[in-house]
A protein has these predicted regions:
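Active-site donor-binding segments of glycosyltransferases and PAPS-dependent sulfotransferases
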Residues: 13-60
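A short, well-ordered alpha-helix in the C-terminal region of glycosyltransferases
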Residues: 213, 293, 300-314, 323
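Nucleotide-activated donor-binding/catalytic signature segment of Leloir-type glycosyltransferases, i.e.
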Residues: 202-220
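Conserved acidic donor-binding segment of nucleotide-sugar-dependent glycosyltransferases
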Residues: 262, 273-285, 293-298
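Membrane-proximal helix-turn-helix segments that form the acceptor-binding/catalytic region
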Residues: 89-120, 128
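Aromatic "clamp/platform" in nucleotide-sugar-dependent glycosyltransferases that forms part
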Residues: 240
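Short alpha-helical donor nucleotide-sugar binding micro-motif in glycosyltransferases
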Residues: 219-220, 227-232
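Conserved donor-binding/catalytic core segment of Leloir-type glycosyltransferases
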Residues: 150-170, 176-181, 190
Length: 327
C-alpha cells in the first residue's frame, strides 16, 4: 500500500515512477529472495534510465543503484525484535538452525544498509530505534502520509471499526473481548481483514456471547474500507509493537479517533491521548473503557477525530518527497 501511495504521489508531482515488486520466495527461501533482489536491474526499466531508487521493505534494499534511499518499514521481524517469541515457538533443533540463519541475516542486512544504500530513512521512531539497536545506524524519520484516496467523514455511527491482517500480533481479540465487558451498552464492531486468526476470532465472539454484535467482513476492497472509515464512531487499532500502521493516518484522514495501546509501537507515536484518540493498556478492560467513552460521548468522538484530521493535514506527500529525494 505504501509503495503504491508513494508512486501515485511521485506521479502527481511530475515524476515518472516505476513500481518494481522484488521477488519474495517465502520464509524458508531467504537466500533466494535476497539474491533475486540483488540481481534485479533497477538501472534501466522499459528503456528508461532510472535517476533515484526508493526501497521499502526487506530485502528490496538489496537492489543496487548509486542513488538509493531505503525508506524502511520493516526487516524480517522474526529474526529481530520478535526473535524471543519466535524462538520459543520452535523445537531446540530448529532453534539452533534458525539462530545461525539469524546471525547470517543480521550480517547481510547490516552490510546492505551500511554499504548498499545512499541513505536510510525510517518510517517511524519505532523502526529508527530498532535500526540503531541492531546496526548502529542513525536515521531520520519520515512518516508516510495518508494515501491520496477519497477520505471523508460521513458521520459517527454506533460501531467501532477495525481493519488489519487477522494474525496474533494485531490483537484484534482485544476489541472482541472489550465488547463482552460492555454488555449493558449497544456497542457493535465491524472487523475487516483476513488471516490465520479469522476462524479463532469468530469462535471467540460466539463463546463470549457477542457474535451478534461483531460483523466480520473478510478482506474488503478499498471503497468498502473507505466507507467504513467514513461512517464509524472510531477506529480500534491495538497491535503489538507495530512498525508504523497505515491504519492510523487513514483514520485521521477520515476524521476518526484511534484507540491504541501503550505497547503498540508506531501508532502510539501519532495518537495523542485525549487529543486524537485514546491510548490505553493492552487489556480488554482498558480497551472497553476507551470504547465506552467514545460510544457514550459522540461529541468527544468528533473532537478527537478533528484532532486526528489536523495531524493528518500536516503529513503531506510534498513534504515527504522533499525529504526522501534529497540524496
Amino acid at each position: 500500500m505504501i509503495a503504491r501511495a508513494l508512486a501515485d504521489a511521485l506521479a502527481r508531482c511530475g515524476h515518472s515512477p516505476h513500481l518494481v515488486i522484488t521477488p519474495d520466495y517465502g520464509f524458508g527461501r531467504l537466500t533466494s529472495t535476497y539474491r533475486a533482489s540483488w540481481t534485479t536491474d533497477v538501472m534501466t526499466i522499459d528503456g528508461c534510465s532510472i535517476d533515484r531508487v526508493v526501497s521499502l521493505r526487506y530485502p528490496s534494499f538489496a537492489v543496487r543503484h548509486p542513488h538509493h534511499v531505503c525508506w524502511l518499514n520493516h526487516t524480517m521481524r522474526e529474526y529481530y525484535d520478535l526473535w524471543p517469541r519466535f524462538a520459543a515457538s520452535i523445537s531446540w533443533r530448529n532453534r539452533v538452525k534458525e539462530s545461525v540463519r539469524r546471525q547470517t541475516l543480521h550480517a547481510v542486512d547490516g552490510w546492505l544498509l551500511h554499504r548498499n544504500v545512499t541513505r536510510v530513512v525510517a518510517q517511524s521512531k519505532t523502526i529508527q530505534q530498532r535500526l540503531a539497536a541492531a546496526f548502529d545506524i542513525r536515521t531520520e524519520v519520515v512518516y508516510p502520509p495518508p494515501p491520496l484516496g477519497s477520505y471523508q467523514c460521513l458521520g459517527y455511527d454506533d460501531f467501532i471499526f477495525a481493519v488489519s491482517r487477522l494474525d496474533p500480533l494485531k490483537r484484534v481479540d482485544l476489541l472482541i473481548r472489550a465488547l463482552a465487558e460492555l454488555p449493558a451498552r449497544h456497542v457493535n464492531a465491524v472487523i475487516a481483514g483476513d488471516g490465520e486468526c479469522a476462524g479463532d476470532l469468530q469462535a471467540l465472539a460466539r463463546s463470549l456471547g457477542v457474535a451478534n454484535r461483531v460483523r466480520f467482513l473478510g478482506r474488503v476492497d478499498e471503497p468498502t474500507m473507505l466507507d467504513c472509515l467514513a461512517r464509524c464512531r472510531a477506529v480500534c487499532f491495538t497491535p503489538y509493537a507495530e512498525d508504523f500502521g497505515f491504519v492510523t493516518v487513514e483514520a485521521f484522514a477520515s476524521r476518526k479517533a484511534v484507540i491504541t495501546c501503550r505497547d503498540s509501537g508506531g501508532p502510539t507515536e501519532l495518537v495523542v491521548d485525549d487529543g486524537s484518540g485514546v491510548v490505553c493498556e493492552p487489556t480488554a478492560a482498558s480497551v472497553a473503557i476507551a470504547v465506552a467513552r467514545l460510544v457514550d460521548d459522540r461529541v468527544l468522538a468528533e473532537r478527537l477525530g478533528s484532532g486526528g484530521a489536523a495531524q493528518a493535514a500536516t503529513m503531506t506527500w510534498d513534504r515527504a518527497l522533499e525529504q526522501l529525494l534529497s540524496v
